[in-house]
Amino acid sequence: MSKTILVMAGGTGGHIFPALAVAHKLRDAGWRVVWLGNPEGMEARLVPQHGFEMVWIKFSALRGKGILRKLLLPVNLLRGFWQGLKAIRQVKPNVVLGMGGYITFPGGMMAALTGVPLVLHEQNSVAGLANRVLASVADRIVTGFPDVIKNGTWVGNPVRPEIAAIAAPAERFAERTGALRLLVIGGSLGAQVLNEMVPQAMALLGESDQPQIVHQAGEKHIEALKANYAAVGVQAHCVSFVEDMAGAYEWADLVICRAGALTIAELAAAGVASILVPFPHAVDDHQTGNAKFLVHAGGAFLLPQTELTPDAIALIRNYSRSQLLEMAEKARSLAKPDATEAVAQICSEIAK
């Protein structure tokens, strides 16, 4: 008889995509996979596309400003716990896996209360509030970065198989000549500061220093981005979404991007040099911590948004392809290509 896992993840792609990788791995191994999500969250749109059974819980973030949110917190918690308990009784999982987002808190607490084995995966270098609380009741804790939570095991963040399968940096760079290849990733929302600063920086470069540019900006910002490049007379391939992320990493010599946990894992798995601009308003400034993982190993440059200027970005004129290859290899040395398998294996080991 096949076993059942209840996967809890929601809110952002950084939680959902790694959880999907594990969910697919377990389903391929014969497991029944059920997903606990918020009907108003990103997971409600993404997860059903992969054919997973859903159960729903309406639960809002524990953090937040405003007197009304604080007054309603007890009601929010009680409702969340009740719905979490109802989901566990309905699904009858052999193990529960929390992959991040506030949605994991009520389900995780009810798993512990009912004696269902609970595995937590923390993607970021600084543990989120839900995982910090749940860590005291979890049976196993695994992390995307080293030394995040006491008693946690560093397994890395699951990435898409096609990214983990990219050829080694030395092999990719072997026949590469001509202009440097610059990939700018703004994310699904488009990082407006990158959309404004990078075109201005490229305008400061001489013709011989001008890289080939692929710039992803998010659907809402694509026309403004094209106008920014046109205004400074710089050619760039502007896209709202990168369909083939593995192909984009494989093509690039250098990536400019934010420092979300999944992005860091992909940069390491692909083995590509990067300039990391952490999102300054991330909870607990966790993106700076994420970035330092690659920076301290020599695989990336850290450029805080407060120091982000066209002149600072234009310093890429000083980077040689051989230097970027060396950085790419250092980034690749930190990769955890078996992260998906490791999380799935731990779930299998402790399932009742």
Curated annotation (Swiss-Prot):
One of its GO terms (biological process) is lipid glycosylation. Its EC number is 2.4.1.227. UDP-N-acetyl-alpha-D-glucosamine binds at T12, G13, G14, N124, R160, S188, Q287. Gene3D superfamilies: Glycogen Phosphorylase B. It catalyses: di-trans,octa-cis-undecaprenyl diphospho-N-acetyl-alpha-D-muramoyl-L-alanyl-D-glutamyl-meso-2,6-diaminopimeloyl-D-alanyl-D-alanine + UDP-N-acetyl-alpha-D-glucosamine = di-trans,octa-cis-undecaprenyl diphospho-[N-acetyl-alpha-D-glucosaminyl-(1->4)]-N-acetyl-alpha-D-muramoyl-L-alanyl-D-glutamyl-meso-2,6-diaminopimeloyl-D-alanyl-D-alanine + UDP + H(+). Pathway: Cell wall biogenesis; peptidoglycan biosynthesis. It is a peripheral membrane protein. It comes from the Bacteria. Pfam families: Glyco_tran_28_C (PF04101), Glyco_transf_28 (PF03033). GO terms for molecular function: UDP-N-acetyl-D-glucosamine:N-acetylmuramoyl-L-alanyl-D-glutamyl-meso-2,6-diaminopimelyl-D-alanyl-D-alanine-diphosphoundecaprenol 4-beta-N-acetylglucosaminlytransferase activity; undecaprenyldiphospho-muramoylpentapeptide beta-N-acetylglucosaminyltransferase activity. Coiled coil: none annotated. GO terms for cellular component: plasma membrane. Keywords: Cell cycle, Cell division, Cell inner membrane, Cell membrane, Cell shape, Cell wall biogenesis/degradation, Glycosyltransferase, Membrane, Peptidoglycan synthesis, Transferase. It is found in: Cell inner membrane. Cell wall formation. Catalyzes the transfer of a GlcNAc subunit on undecaprenyl-pyrophosphoryl-MurNAc-pentapeptide (lipid intermediate I) to form undecaprenyl-pyrophosphoryl-MurNAc-(pentapeptide)GlcNAc (lipid intermediate II). Belongs to the glycosyltransferase 28 family. MurG subfamily. PANTHER family: GLYCOSYLTRANSFERASE, UDP-N-ACETYLGLUCOSAMINE--N-ACETYLMURAMYL-(PENTAPEPTIDE) PYROPHOSPHORYL-UNDECAPRENOL N-ACETYLGLUCOSAMINE TRANSFERASE 1. This is UDP-N-acetylglucosamine--N-acetylmuramyl-(pentapeptide) pyrophosphoryl-undecaprenol N-acetylglucosamine transferase.
